[in-house]
Structures are given as C-alpha cells and as structure tokens.
C-alpha cells in the first residue's frame, strides 16, 4: 500500500522515464519544419554528416533528436507514414537498450527504424532479429526503401544463402534475419578453418522483434548443430515392445504413511514436470521382460554398468509412448515424425528431440528410425544474445515477464502508451463442467457472430483442438478458415483477411504473429494479389484495385458498427502473456473489439492447477449441466494458477542458464583460442607453450617432482622419447657423467631436446611452410575434443541430480566436474597436437600443403549435419546433401573413410596413398 501511495506522488519508474523521453520528443518535433524544407539530396546528405560527427567523437545520444527527425521526414516522403510521438518514445527506449512494450497495431516495425538508423551511423552494423524468414524478408524490403533513401545499405540473412551472400548481408549497415540464423552463423563462424570463411563481423547492437517469444518462450531450447552418431535402430524397436507390457501405478501415496495407492504398477507419471518414473516393481518387470527378449543376461539388473545405455533407451521409450501424443506434441507427415511447437502450434520441420526421444517416438509410430545425433556446437539464446554489446527488444506483451528480462538479460521494460486508447471489451471467463459443454457454448457464440456478420478469431492451444473446432463448425455448416501448423505457408495471407465480414478464422495460439488483422480486410494484401495476376491488363487492374479499396473501406465501417473483431478462446495457455497476445489481436489502433475465454474443468491447466477449487465453487452453487460459472473470483483463480506455472517455468529457464553458464565460459575460451589461432601469422609461441607443457607432464611420469635419483626411471623415459616421440636423448649418460643433477635439470634437458628436434624440422621444411599445417592440426584437434566434451557435459548434466541423494549440491558438483573435464580436454589437445607435430615425417613443403588440405577436407566434407532450434515457423534447417555445398556450414568433423596403403590417395593426386599423404602418418 505504501508503495502505491509513493507511486501516486512521485510516479512510477516507467512514468519518470517517459517524462524524460517526452522532452526529447519536443526537440524532435521542433526540427520537423526545418527538415521539411530540405530536398531529398539534402536530407540524404544528413546521413554522411552524422557519420562524420560520430567518427569525430560525438555521441549517439547527442545526435538522437536530429537523427530521429531525419528518419521521420524520410518516412513521410517514402513510406507515406509519419512516426507518432509514442513511436518516438519507443525508439528512444530501444536505443537505450530496453524492451519497449507496444500494443498490437502500434507500428513496432516503423518504430524500430529510429534506433536502427541512429546506431547504424557507427558503421559497426545493426541486427534486426525477427521470429521467421517471412517477417525478416518483408521488413527488410518494406523498411529497406526508407533506409536506402537515407543512404543506408540493408542486408537479409536467410538460410541456404552462400557464404558470399551472407558476408554481403552482414557487411551492410543494417541486417535483418531470424534469431536462429544469427545464432547458427555465430556457431558456424567458430567452426571454420579460414579467416575469410567467417560471415559475421562482430555483435554490436541487436533489436529483437517479438522479444518475449525469442528470449522467453524459446529460451529452454538451445541452438544445436549436430551430426549423426551410432545407429541403434534395432534397440529402439525392441525396447518399444517393452512399454505396452508395463502398467501404470494409479493413485498417490501419502509420503508419511505410504498409504493411498489403489493400484500398484510399474511406472508413475508426473504431469506437472512432464516426467515418467519406473517403480521398484517396474524395474523388476522391465528386467524380466528384457531377459526374456535376450537383451540382458540372467540375473543382470538395469543398473549394471553394461546396461546403462539400455536404461537410457527404456526411459526414452517410456517418455515417447506415455508423454508425447500424436497431433498434440507431433504429427506424422510423409513417414516422418514432425514436432509441433508448444507455444505456437506450428510444425518445426527438421527439428528433432534429443536423448533418443525422437527415435523412440519413431519406433512407436512405425516410421523409419533415423540415427541419433552427436552435438557439434551449441549455444542457448540467453548466452548468444548476451554477447551483443547492446541489446533491446519490442513486443506487445512484455510487462508480465519484466522481472525475467531484468534478471536474466539485464533488460528493463518500458511500457509505451498507445497512440489511441483501446476499446476492446475483455469479458470474464466462462467455465463449464465438461469439454462438450464448453465447445457447445463457443460454437453458439461463433454462430451468433456469423449471423450478424462480425468477424471471429478462434484461438486454440494445439492442432488437435483446432481440428475439433474445425469439425464442429463443418457440422454446423459455418464457413471458416483454419490456420495451424499444417498450413503455416499461407498464414500471413489468411490472418490479413481475418477481419472481413462474416469471416471465421481458427488459429493455434499466435500463428500469423507479425501480421495485423485489419477490420474490413487488409487492402494492401488484396492489391498485391491483383498486381500479381497476369491475366489482367493495366486498366483492369486499376479498376479492380479501386473496387477493392472502396469495398474494404465500407466493410471497415460495417465491422466497427458490429463490434469489431471478436476473439473466442477455447483454453487458457499456461502463460498469461500468450493469452494477452491472443486478445491483443483485437482492438488495434483504437478499433472496437471483444474477447472471451471458454474453459472447462477438463482443460489441462484447470485440471492440474485450478480444477479442484473451481469445481468446489460449482458444486456449492449446485450448477446444472450446460451452465457456466462466470465470476471475477474464478478468473483470478485461473490467473493465479498461471502465475504458478510461469514461476515454475522461470525457475526452469534460470536453472538451465546456471548450468549453461558453465559450458558458456568454456565455449568462450575455446572460441577465443580458435580465433587467436586463425588470426595469428606466427603460431610458434602457442606451439612452444603446448610442447613445454606436454614434455613436462611426460617427464614427471618418470622423474617425479622433488624426487631423488633412486626414484627415477631414466631408461623408461629414454625409451618413450625414442619410440613415441622420435627423440634420441642419451639421458642416462648425462646423468652418470654429472656430479649432481636435480629433477628440474632433467626436465630442462628433455625440454631442450624436444625444442631442438622441432627446430631441426622447422629448419628443414621452412617455418612459413609449416604454419598452415600447424594451424589445421590445432583447429582439428580442438574441434574433435570439444565435440567429445559437449557429449560428456550432456551425460554429466543428465545424472547430476542424483548427487543430491549423497547430500551434495548438484550445481556445485556439476561446476566442479565440468571444470575437471575441461582440464582433460585441454590436456588432450596439448598432447595430441604436440605428438602430431613432433612425429610427422615431412620431406617437402608441398607435402605439408597437401596434408593440410587433406585434414581440412576431412572437416569440410561431412554430411548428415542437422540444425536444431526452437522456432515459430518450423523453418529449422536440416541439412544433409547441402552440407558439403555450404562452406560455412560444413565443419563437422572427419567423414573420410579409412584408406588402405595401396589405395588411391583421397587428395586426388592419382598416387598411391603410401606414396602421397600416407608418408605423413
């Protein structure tokens, strides 16, 4: 209460920020008359003037009023749109590295042009991040007209572009693209072998459109580049037969007494955490079945070391069969299991679940099982976007997640007031006892809207529910259009016309996000279709366009009279923000509109979190069948349940980040080392450091620290140096001839001998000739061990929670063991690189060049590379055949088959392998 009183007196933090920004808006508005008098060339020349002033040391903040005024004037001339004052407020918020919450229809795309232009003046590049390729291309073409007019270059970063096309896109002043593609380019840039193969030029400033979708909804799933691992097809098929033979344990036991279990069984399901667990009886049943199938020997248990992988397969099969359902979590298309995005209901073609889950679902559905993937490179969106020097974002719904944006990304949320106050009527939820009653009420509402001509947008949380509504509307003979993951290619066109008279549109969650629903229809989309119609001549096109403009204007007035766009939702999403996004489709720019949620006690959110409380209310009121409860207390109860889920999901994302921060620190070290190696003209300091460490470790195996001569194994050290390292050192003679010698002096002699042997090799071949070979050996060793390290971290992460049973803190244990694993990685690289460079036998510089090319070729020619990422559109790239065609996509480890000594050399020289590159091994 005290905080409310203080807010009324002093204003909120948001109010104070906006008050400061409005003073700057007054300065911008004061420049408008002055800039209107400039001709196009004079206005365009302002860009170079600003760039010169920035180069001379003037800050962007000082330039802001003039730069924003130039963009506004350019937009008036080119786009025929003038930035509203509230858009200026949003632009300032974005420039200051904050999140701007602007309601649907307030012109976020145009708002972004202000800070984008201002920050592009530095010449360091600005990235505008969107949720899908359609929006990236649309916005780049649309706003590109304005940027080009002002003398700025614009690039579009899309999947399947060549290296040269991507480099051109990134070298532009402003680059549009998706979060996935920006992230994958970063990973690929840290997998290349040549400096010229990188495409990005640094991460300066990013503006993330639909920032809540990218930084919140998709933050639990990292970007992963993976390649196929060992094939376990037969094992998946066999284990899939085990699950139907197991039974579920029904009921719930009292943890204190153990009483209350009505039906013993083999496994339990926790719907809240989306997990399945074997009971003690389940372990015994599974072991018996696996023994009968011949998969484990008699008397063996699932916890035997030899059966660890079997346990992995069994749990994957349990999850795939019991927790993941067709047409809800995935669909089967053309013999493939395609994941459905839980946030948008769209297909995520090319994305695959990890840990064998996808293969388990494929076995369940009887489709072809594809091999498991090994992670080659990975990063979370949290850690990728925190690499930018400055980050900001915009969305229609950020305030409910303001704490998470601040906590995880350090981003403050600024709520920008609308240009016109919304007239949308958000009606109370109606809760029914059963799903059937809920759908009957929703269909009745839809029919009433249709009969009076009011357009309706029906929101669902899954494809399955959208198809139920679809069938019910067909049964009622109500014409409608369906917008879900199965038709996402047409979604922008469908959404654009969802505001026309008598239009009924069914949409999964926020399908079509980024496209406005204009009352009476989007005339621009209709005009595009007319202009693309080759059967019409110019006169006919002009006549049709005039007719459409008149028709849409008339329909707009009619729809407003009827109450605007009606939103009908058939389920609450677990996030209030997603519900608000659906509501936000209606009432744009001061238009009328209304929304209503129809719920039942059988809905997942209600059943798990709020059902008992609402059910008791309905029973006390003795409500008859078909009657709904409609009260503020019910809506508040549901929102309370949503807050619980949001808090749990936040904890999950925060925990993921805490674990990923460990690998992120290591990733930074590895990537920095790779970049240093590629950028260095002389690698001898790095090689010398590795060699010194390697031979110190080797020597200490035979001559321990602070030991006496009697403890030394000099003969063993001499033999190892000679046999494994090709170094002849008469160490025993030197020790015998010396009056006294310490272990440190022995180490110095070994190091000196190693350095001399390497120096001889360099002198014979030439330092310049050896550098590229050293570079490739270093990079390949780092890459291969980094991939193994990622797999080791994955396995460590999966089982680390068990440390809690030993009274240890899992997170601290993970950090400790991950650090130890990283130390092992560095040791492995040190030893492998040193051994390769010390023992390689080379006769000429030409041989070295061929060897370097062969090593690099092995890293570039792998196929079956898979890109995994969460996305709204399902445009996740799965590259198999194209991997060898795209230079920046290719580095994924060795795919060269083993070559026989008498086989032709893979380098293409025509010589036998033993007479060509075989000499080097």
From Swiss-Prot:
Its EC number is 7.4.2.8. Zn(2+) binds at residues 905, 907, 916-917. ATP binds at residues 87, 105-109, 516. InterPro entries: Helicase_ATP-bd, Helicase_C-like, P-loop_NTPase, SEC_C_motif, SecA, SecA_CS, SecA_DEAD, SecA_motor_DEAD. Its cofactor is Zn(2+). May bind 1 zinc ion per subunit. It comes from the Bacteria. Monomer and homodimer. Part of the essential Sec protein translocation apparatus which comprises SecA, SecYEG and auxiliary proteins SecDF-YajC and YidC. Keywords: ATP-binding, Cell inner membrane, Cell membrane, Cytoplasm, Membrane, Metal-binding, Nucleotide-binding, Protein transport, Translocase, Translocation, Transport, Zinc. Belongs to the SecA family. Part of the Sec protein translocase complex. Interacts with the SecYEG preprotein conducting channel. Has a central role in coupling the hydrolysis of ATP to the transfer of proteins into and across the cell membrane, serving both as a receptor for the preprotein-SecB complex and as an ATP-driven molecular motor driving the stepwise translocation of polypeptide chains across the membrane. The gene is secA. One of its GO terms (biological process) is intracellular protein transmembrane transport. It is found in: Cell inner membrane; Cytoplasm. This is Protein translocase subunit SecA.
